[in-house]
Structure formats: structure tokens, C-alpha cells
Amino acid sequence: MELDLRGMMSEDALDKLETYLDKATMAGMPFVRIIHGKGTGKLRQEVRAVLKNHPHVTSFEEGGEKEGGEGVTVAKMSD
């Protein structure tokens, strides 16, 4: 399951992220991929701040080389 936030304004992107995380939790997804793009890194920082404080996210990391690298964050969801 993945969410593409590229090109979105921060407020809209973070609203979509919250909804996405809720749906992923309800679906029992073990992990999620969030595509925020590389750009200036502002959206990446905001996404990771939300993930850091989300009760159902246990950890997150930059996507692998074949997943999009620094333009993607992969979050592990709690059981």
C-alpha cells in the first residue's frame, strides 16, 4: 500500500497522510510506503514528524535504492 504526496501543499498532504495511516491500520497492513519526493525536503520532514508521533507507526526509514531512496519513506505499522 502506498501514498503519493508529490506536488501537494503540506496541509493537504498531511491530511491525506492521516487518513491513509488510519486506513492502513484498519486493514492490518504491516508497512506502508509514502512517496513525498526529493525536492527541498520540507514535505519529507513533515511526513516523518507525523510518523514519529503516530501511535500505530513503530518505525520508519528511507526507501531503498529501488524504492525511490530519499523520495520515499517506508513505515512499519504496529500489529
Show where each model-derived region lies.
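Long, charged, low-complexity intrinsically disordered regions
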Residues: 1-79
